[in-house]
Amino acid sequence: MNISHPYRYAHFTNGIPYHKYFISQSDQSGGKIFGSEFKFDFQEDYNNVTHTIDVFIGDRKECILITIEEDNKKVAHIQNFHYHETCDLYKKLPRISGTRILMKTALEYISLEKRIKKVTLTDKAVFTHKSDKIQLFILYLFKYGESYYQKNFGFKYMKKIDQITQAENMKIREKHFINKKKVKKELLQYFAKEKVERFLEFIEESQLISEFVKNFTCLNNLFDIYFAFLKYEFKDKKYNNLFEEVLYKKLK
């Protein structure tokens, strides 16, 4: 990530010119990076076409890709993040805990570049049970009131730059966030009694369970209804960019 890395040489990939920059640290050697008791390959490529530094941790296709724009080295973007047991060199990365180890390793690696002050990502993960699928983002919101990356790594929602002042923002919060029970009641009125009971049972449970996805596959529709309810409440397009924050506050 730093163009002053000592092991710099030019090479070509698919005809596109790159430069590699390997970090030289006491706890790393030979293009390896350590995370807990696991070891991962890493590679940094400079892409002259996109003008980004592309950092691969683990397998180039299956694990993590981080990009840093050449003209904005304060921000790192995690473009791909996929768990696979072969991501570490010993090919035995465990499920669940291995996912967290892989991400923490990537964040620690990013922290070696002192200029980077912000890390962004988009959660597109899907939780699958047999033929049923649901976005992990939605499942965690309804279960914990936080997304997966909020709960496990401290990420925060990004909000578009808007003209809303801090005073206006606080006024909106006071109006729409205080009476949570009323909002929950309004939301649950959209569903049949048995679905409401199943939903209430689910949010009381302590762990994510695949049976929920099997028996309550309308959760994606519920999420859409919740958005529609919020849009009806706000009645103003300039507040649309606060919907994710509203969901987080309401379901916490």
Protein language model features and the residues they cover:
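Non-catalytic substrate-recognition and accessory regions of acyl/acetyltransferase enzymes
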Residues: 1-97, 101-252
